[in-house]
Amino acid sequence: MAKPATRNTKKKVKKTVVDGVAHVHASFNNTIVTITDRQGNALSWATAGGSGFRGSRKSTPFAAQVAAERAGTVAQEFGLKNVDVMIKGPGPGRESAVRALNALGLRINNITDVTPIPHNGCRPPKKRRV
């Protein structure tokens, strides 16, 4: 009699990362939060648009807070405890995303603004007339 087929698959080992980097990209329209390890390998990410906010609600501080909470909770499953925060962009979700990461219990070591500043590069968009 033949044996029932069994698969020889190994259980995937979940890596544990204690120190990481939280990249917050806050544009005027959306906020993207990516949490990586020190080498830059992504552990988790979330956006304000992917968190259920659409249209003008996507560009609010509350939407950035929800996105940071979603990315942070997934990263904590990897054992993340300490983060360095890199903030890029002029958007409204800059500060609330950092506050949300702090409220999750992640220890924030330092906060760095890495917004690219042109040395007279491209012409900026025209001013809004409302």
Curated annotation (Swiss-Prot):
Belongs to the universal ribosomal protein uS11 family. Located on the platform of the 30S subunit, it bridges several disparate RNA helices of the 16S rRNA. Forms part of the Shine-Dalgarno cleft in the 70S ribosome. The keyword Lipid biosynthesis does not apply. GO terms for molecular function: rRNA binding; structural constituent of ribosome. The keyword RNA-binding applies. This is Small ribosomal subunit protein uS11. It holds the Pfam family Ribosomal_S11.
